[in-house]
Curated annotation (Swiss-Prot):
Gene3D superfamilies listed in its UniProt record: 1.10.287.1490, 1.20.58.60, 2.60.120.40
Keyword entries, A-Z: Cell adhesion, Coiled coil, Collagen, Disulfide bond, Extracellular matrix, Glycoprotein, Secreted, Signal
Record's protein name: EMILIN-2
Comp. bias regions, Pro residues: 789-812
Principal location: secreted
Every Collagen-like domain range: 840-892
Native organism: Homo sapiens
């Protein structure tokens, strides 16, 4: 521990050299060392940073011990020198070995990975043997023996397209999302490595500043010590700057009276030497350590000797670090954008394929629609021709029986309208989704991709339109089918009624021939009533089927997603209008045809009612005839009995035909009437049969058309499901795209914050390097010469030693000039820990934040965060493990207050080409807009609304008509800011003294031109209060109104 002490005048030069070496070593240690391998996270994504606590041994000063050293009074190689020895009492420090806990970052395998190179993951348990990657060493500590051997790892190369080639550690089966997440993790690790480098550089500079402060204090104590020792000079001893001279032991025994003074002085010298010895030993150890590190760095670099100055070296080092950071950031951004591009292309390819599939299906639907349309037109023409034929026939049907059919037709029209509305809603929702996909993000340039997506969306819209046409034609065919079925059913029912009526008439004829008995005629109403009941039953059954079809259609419409409604895009309005026109024309045609059918059925019902009334009247006539015949027969029998009883009056027999003649005449008349009635009924039956044949066929076809409509509704269900799947797929793609964009924005914001923090740190680094250089120059300038001092004359009083200038103040405590006559103080205690201050507030570089807590927070050691149990590392010392968070950075001054909008370009300019207002005055409506950036000026109201708080330049030029004037006011939020009068300012009292007949001065055009402060939402306009403002009927502007946003309000800067 003890070494011979060198002469004191040479010590300060040694300190200066040691400080220079310390500064160089600290700067070299701040960044990644050239001899060490690169950090694994820069090339491999399976390494994770853990915060660990380790116990390290260190030598701690524990007091000092004194010893007596014999010294010669003369220097080396000085021949004429007395041989008397001088004994000096010196002090040396005493050190003991202690242990302390330090916290550092250590790279270990991430959870789920294992192996020597952390390449064995959950998907690939067996890996071939590859070189073990190098484990990063702490930039402020040496590598321990338990770290694995260092091997170089192959770097990733970039392809010509700028994308990173996958390394052997990346699973080729991973999808684009996993690759993006891993690349983002690589960027975060790179930023963390740069942050760690800057923090190490700050800690090194802080240590250099602290050592420089201690060295300055030691230098001051050393220069103060010769003054203390020179107060008691001895005639045969050499005065030194830090020791107390003494004579041989015999001399001490002879001077008992001066021992107390010597002991007190020895105590003072002991304290001083103790402090100096401690500092020298500490500085010596640090210098040796830095010299060894410098030697290693020089051997690893194997480059020529640096001939640059210190500032140029610092500048080159910082520039290299900033360039490396820029290259890494740009490379990461290129990779991220390439991954996003590949992902978007993959998703768009899948979407295109799906749209192509639906397009092929829609083409088949279009062909089917064409066929259905052709058949529908043919059926409509046939139905129109059939319905026009029986228009001149007599009415034979009851109009009350056809009310249900009209109601059903109206219901079918409502259903068609509902289906069309549902189709429009689906198309509108699809258009909204496509419009949202077409609108690009302002921060990302995907013009080519959006154009391609727009083209594919147009194809999808066209297919949707064709699908609408398909639905229209299908419904049209279903309606025609139902109408045909209804006609067929009516024909069948009328045929059955004709058959029954024929049988009734035949029975009536038979009964009339058999003495015209009434039972046959009485049975006609019953038969007719049963036929009507069957017709009503059939119509009710048809109504029920139509109601079922309506319920199915309503369920299909309600089953569609509620968010599909929306307005059709402008480019599809024409197609939609055409579709609606076709639907309306179809509805009108069907409604007209159904009305004609209804009229025909009513005529048939009227004919049936008339026939029923005729039959009833015939039945009454037959009954009356039967009564007359019975009366006639009774009278005949009575007359014959009376003439028989008389016997002698035979002449009365000739008179018997007289009562029989009316009977014969009545029978013949009744027979003629019956013949006419029969012929009329037969003719009417033929007419009714001809009229109702088409209706019967159409009614019979309604049931088949209803079933066809049910099938169409089932097809609509499948189409609705396909549209729902398309919507879900589009929503997934859009949400994934927005997630990627948000992740990119977050990464860019974090990188921006990191770059700003690095810039601040570099600026502070420059300032502190400049301070250190200044301090070193001051130390070198004010150090005493290296020559050996000669003993001062005993008669002269000791001079006060030259002291260096005080160092600049430090945050740990202000440096004060010490008085040489005061007792030396003990070494200062290390400064207490306090929360970090913002950079620039003090002169010291300190970390502005601590590492964030790892996963699972636990506190141990000195209160640092401890992670959850991770994978066991190679070290033997237990410590907290977990993912390390990024340290904090100084908060940059806010550019704008929270919540204040970011100002953008705002300007407008408008002119007047028409009459500004209907009355004589008011707000001028500058109708012709030339520029309106930000859409801040409303030409319909003539008001400019300020979007932000700030300064605005407002300009207005008003031109009156010839031989007229204009008086106007510039209004801001209904408050007058400036006035204008083209005739000039006038005082009110002059108006009373103006001579009569004086000319009115009109003047020329007037203008407002001023800078005003506006708040967000303030309204600015020009109000004319008098005069006439010039305007023309042509596109010529004589009055203008302009404004521009200059800069935001100063409180937001």
């Amino acid at each position: 521990m003890w070494q011979p002490r060198r002469p004191w005048p040479r010590v300060p030069w040694r300190w200066a050299l040691a400080l220079l070496a310390l500064v160089g070593a600290g700067l070299c240690h701040a960044g990644p060392q050239p001899g060490y391998p690169a950090r694994p996270s820069a090339r491999n994504k399976n390494w994770c940073a853990y915060i660990v606590n380790k116990n390290v041994s260190c030598s701690v000063l524990e007091g000092s011990e004194s010893f007596i050293q014999a010294q010669y009074n003369c220097a080396w190689n000085q021949m004429p020198c007395p041989s008397a020895l001088v004994y000096r009492v010196n002090f040396r420090p005493r050190y003991v070995t202690r242990y302390k806990t330090v916290t550092q970052l250590e790279w270990r395998c991430c959870p789920g990975f294992r192996g020597g190179d952390c390449q064995e993951g959950p998907k690939d348990p067996v890996k071939t043997l590859r070189p073990t990657p190098a484990r990063p060493r702490n930039s402020l500590k040496k590598a321990t023996d338990n770290e694995p051997s260092q091997f170089s790892e192959p770097r990733k190369t970039l392809s010509p397209t700028g994308t990173a080639q996958p390394s052997w550690g990346v699973d080729p089966k991973e999808g684009p999302q996993e690759l993006q997440e891993k690349k983002i993790q690589v960027l975060e690790e790179k930023v963390l490595r740069l942050t760690r480098t800057v923090l190490d550089l700050q800690s090194s500079l802080a240590g250099v500043s602290e050592n420089l402060k201690h060295a300055t204090q030691d230098d001051a104590s050393r220069t103060r010590a010769p003054g203390l020792s020179s107060q008691h000079p001895k005639p045969d001893t050499t005065v030194s700057g830090d020791t107390e001279t003494g004579q041989s032991p015999g001399v001490f025994n002879t001077k008992e009276s001066g021992m107390k003074d010597i002991k007190s002085e020895l105590a003072e010298v002991k304290d001083t030497l103790k402090n100096k010895s401690d500092k020298l030993e500490e500085l010596d150890g640090k210098v040796k350590g830095y010299e060894g590190q410098l030697r290693q760095l020089q051997e690893a670099a194997q480059g020529p000797t640096v001939t640059m100055t210190t500032n140029e070296l610092y500048q080159a080092y910082v520039d290299s670090k900033i360039d490396a950071l820029r290259e890494e950031l740009m490379e990461g951004m290129d990779r991220k954008l390439a991954d996003l591009k590949n992902s978007c292309e993959y998703k768009l390819t899948g979407l295109q394929q799906q749209c192509d599939d639906y397009g092929s299906s829609y083409l088949g639907v279009i062909e089917l629609i064409g066929e259905k349309e052709t058949s529908l037109r043919k059926e409509i023409n046939n139905l129109r021709a059939r319905l026009q034929e029986p228009s001149a026939q007599a009415n034979c049907c009851d109009s009350e029986k056809n009310g249900d059919i009209g109601q059903q037709i109206k219901t079918l029209d409502q259903k068609i309208e509902r289906v069309a509305e549902a189709t429009r809603m689906l198309n509108g929702r699809l258009d909204n989704e496509f419009d949202r996909l077409i609108v690009p993000e302002p921060d990302v340039d995907f013009d080519a991709k959006w154009n391609e997506l727009d083209a594919r969306i147009n194809v999808t819209e066209k297919n949707a339109e064709e699908h609408c046409f398909y639905i229209e034609e299908t419904l049209r065919g279903a309606i025609n089918g139902e109408v045909g079925d209804l006609k067929q059913l009516v024909d069948q029912k009328i045929q059955s009624l004709e058959d029954r009526l024929g049988s009734v008439l035949l029975q009536m004829t038979n009964n009339t021939g058999a003495e015209l008995s009434p039972p046959g005629a009485a049975a006609l109403p019953g038969v007719s009533g049963s036929g009507d009941e069957r017709v009503m039953m059939e119509l009710n059954h048809l109504k029920d089927k139509v109601q079922v079809v309506e319920d199915i259609c309503l369920l299909n419409i309600q089953g569609k997603p509620h968010g599909m409604e929306g307005a059709l895009p402008n480019r599809e309005d024409r197609a939609v209008r055409d579709s609606l026109h076709l639907l309306k024309s179809l509805n009108d045609t069907m409604h007209r045809k159904f009305q004609e059918t209804e009229q025909t059925i009513q005529k048939l019902q009227q004919d049936f009612s008339f026939l029923y009334s005729q039959l009833n009247h015939t039945e009454n006539d037959v009954t009356h005839l039967q009564k007359e015949m019975s009366n006639c027969r009774a009278g005949e029998n009575a007359g014959m009995g009376r003439f028989t009883k008389v016997g002698e009056q035979e002449r009365t027999v000739d008179t018997l035909p007289s009562p029989q003649h009316p009977v014969a005449h009545c029978c013949s008349q009744l027979e003629e009437r019956w013949q006419r009635l029969q012929s009329q009924v037969i003719s009417e039956l033929d007419a009714c049969k001809e009229c109702t044949q088409g209706v019967q066929r159409e009614v019979s076809m309604v049931e088949g058309r209803v079933s066809h409509m049910e099938k169409t509704c089932s097809k609509l269900d499948s189409i609705s499901g396909n549209l729902q799947r398309i919507k879900e797929g589009l929503n997934k793609h859009v949400s994934s795209l927005w997630n990627c964009v948000r992740q990119m924005n977050g990464t860019l914001r974090s990188h921006s914050r990191d770059i700003s923090g690095l810039k601040n740190s570099v600026q502070q680094f420059y300032s502190h390097v400049f301070q250190i250089s200044t301090d070193l120059q001051d130390l070198v300038k004010f150090q005493p010469s290296a020559k050996a001092p000669s003993p001062p004359p005993p008669a002269e009083a000791p001079k006060e030693p030259l002291q260096p200038e005080p160092a600049p103040p430090r945050p740990s405590g202000p440096a004060t000039a010490e008085d040489p006559g005061r007792r030396p103080v003990l070494p200062q205690r290390p400064p207490e820990e306090r929360p970090p201050q913002p950079p620039g507030s003090t002169g010291v570089i300190a970390e502005t934040g601590q590492a964030g807590p790892p996963a699972g927070a636990g506190v141990s050691g000195r209160g640092l965060p401890r992670g959850v149990d991770g994978q066991t590392g190679s070290g033997t010392v237990p410590g907290a493990e977990g993912f390390a968070g990024a340290p904090g950075y100084p908060k940059s001054p806010p550019v704008a207050s929270p919540g204040a909008p970011v100002p953008s370009l705002v300007s407008f300019s408008a002119g007047l080409t028409q009459k500004p207002f209907p009355s004589d005055g008011g707000v001028v409506l500058f109708n012709k807009v030339l520029v309106n950036d930000g859409d801040v000026y409303n030409p319909s109201t003539g008001v400019f609304t300020a979007p932000y708080d700030g300064r605005y330049l407002i300009t207005a030029t008003l031109t009156p008509e010839r031989d007229a004037y204009v008086e106007a006011v510039l209004s801001v939020s209904n408050a007058s800011v400036a006035q204008l009068h083209t005739a000039g300012y006038r005082r009110e009292f002059l108006e009373y003294h103006r001579p009569p007949g004086a000319l009115h001065t009109c003047g020329g055009p007037g203008a407002f031109h001023l800078i005003v402060h506006l708040k967000a939402g303030d309204a600015v306009n020009v109000v004319v209060t008098g005069g006439k403002l010039a305007h023309t009927d042509f596109d010529e502007m004589y009055s203008t109104f302009s404004g521009v946003f200059l800069y935001p309000f100063l409180s937001h800067l």
